[in-house]
Amino acid sequence: MRKLAYLAIACTTVITACGAEAPQPSPQPTAEPPLAATAPPRPNLPNWKEEMPLPFPFPEGAFAPVDAFVQAQQLGRGVNFGNMLEAPKEGEWGLVVREEYFPLVRQAGFDTVRVPIRWSAHALRQPPYTIAPEFFQRIDWVIENALQNDLNVVINMHHYEELFKDLEGERERFLVLWDQIATRYRNLPPEVLFEPLNEPHGALDNESWEELFKQVLAVIRRTNPHRNVIFTGADMGTLNGLLQAKRPNDDPHLLATFHYYLPFAFTHQGAEWVEGSSAWLGTSWRGNGTQRANVDYDMDRAVRWGKQNNMPVWMGEFGAYSKADLDSRVAWTNYVARAAEARGLTWAYWEFGSGFGVYDPISLQWNEPILNVLIQKQEATGR
């Protein structure tokens, strides 16, 4: 399995560092040709100090790059570890990441975990904007557990609310945070993907977000020249936001993503954080002809955008809040997932164990009706 190969490489590195004799390294993978487009120059950023080594080191250049279209398919069926590390403080929203969650989601049949992270709450507010070592260690642990359980892992930056309100005041800090993240994880296997920002909005319109994405991509590429990075549109990362965007440059290691919560009055009925959503309570989704046609139309538009921009497209979030009736949630989830898959789109469900959850962390039981339309049992047991 992939995880065993990675652990073997990591163990070899540790043994060598301790002075023991290690096997001769395998031939290094052939480097890819230079990127088709010249990346913009890396901004002058405040110096920060990398204070601690990774607990699971990998040698530089140990892994061959993965084609973006290939990796988009490898993401398969994923789940978001939402309401955990993107809370102001882990546990504040009722959930923490637990070790048993990783084998649990893998054994259920998921291929990927997307990990929303509020990095901005765990770093200095002033230069050099250093990320707290103990928080980095927590993310190290998450990544290590994902890889050990043969899961792809998408690391993002979530709920950077200050950036959405004050782009110029937060631009430098945003770039320095990603400089630290990218540098720390530069030698990890390609199954670790970077998603620079979740749901750009507010001060980030299409034009300003495209400019900022190019800047952060240049920062990442200094240490991760071939890691796949995930691009999204503005307008909260919606499909409409993606459709209004264009491929940022000719970098071959880019995937595109969008989030799908339509019809919004159905998926967010009764959501406490959405003003007026209580008026939508009782909205159902039974999959009539018009409802199915709307989903098909949207998925066709996502695929068309990908072809026009020569980028693989990944649906990074979709789900319906638990205030909707279960039959409607099951019908909607099933149809959206199957419509995406029929067009070659992979996805990650929002989310694991909270208000949209496919798992109940209190009863320690899966929400079987939702799980069974996300991943059929015969597929899960055959893995």
Feature locations, PLM:
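Bacterial signal peptide processing site
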Residues: 19-21
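N-terminal carbohydrate-binding accessory modules
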Residues: 29, 35-114, 129-130, 305, ...
